[in-house]
Amino acid sequence: MKKIQAGTVGIGLRHPHYQTLLDQLPTLGFLEVHSENYFNPHSQNRFYLEQIAAHYPLSFHGIGLSIGSSEDISKTHLQNLKQIIDIFQPVLVSDHISWSSLQSNFFNDLLPIPYTKKALSCFVNNLNQTQEHLQRQILIENPSSYLEYNDSEMSEPEFINEIVKQTGCGLLLDLNNVYVSATNHQFSVEKYLDIIDHTTVQEIHLAGFTQKQVNNSTMLIDTHSTLISQSVWDIYQTYMSTKKTDALTLIEWDLDIPKLGTLIEEHNKAINIKQSLCTSDKHV
């Protein structure tokens, strides 16, 4: 496992950038990959990852564990994930607060769960099973949200805190998701972040969203297909200045993927924000 500097900034590794990364080897803190894309040892993805991993620390971000399902975690999925973790030794491993499978049927989406005691119990059991099988801590990511369950018994940050408390997992705090959900459901970003236990945050995600008109109102969609909005940058700057965290920061871009240089510009913007805050602290 390549060493990683605390508080460093990285980008998501995507197929269009494989060769450019190897040719240019730009200065990046780490690369994050979607775990499931590298399960096949004979795939082109694995071929390139083996080369790229020689130059950069890695983080694994999953989309298919379906930890929020009422059923047990897929043993096959866990075995595949454990295998690539053992091979590549990523710095962090993460997945989502969501479900995506039922009765051996997989849905290509991150579906929401109700914030009830029953759902909490299912999630905790599946997460404990996952961490036990992998023999390591994993991080869970707060979701972007477009609907709310009427039978939820607690707020999202309260639900997240309970998961962390009962499993010992870490938190991947997606600030774009917080902003998207806060806008869609009209709650306060500041209050949400005040409730979260920030001592458990080990990674921060930043990404872009798009807007869609629904029933004469504007809904934000977490598409990861645009530049990070100024609103999210402002939240990031405030968060970093008040929480003094050593969490890693990741720039995500999954759709309408631009040239590598665009991601590096966003990467450098995050670094500049962190450096400006360090300079300000020295002059206080």
Curated annotation (Swiss-Prot):
Entry coiled-coil feature ranges: none
Entry superkingdom: Bacteria
Gene3D superfamilies, alphabetized: Divalent-metal-dependent TIM barrel enzymes
Family membership: Belongs to the UPF0276 family.
Official protein name in the record: UPF0276 protein Ping_0944
The species this protein was found in: Psychromonas ingrahamii (strain DSM 17664 / CCUG 51855 / 37)
Lineage start: Bacteria, Pseudomonadati, Pseudomonadota, Gammaproteobacteria, Alteromonadales
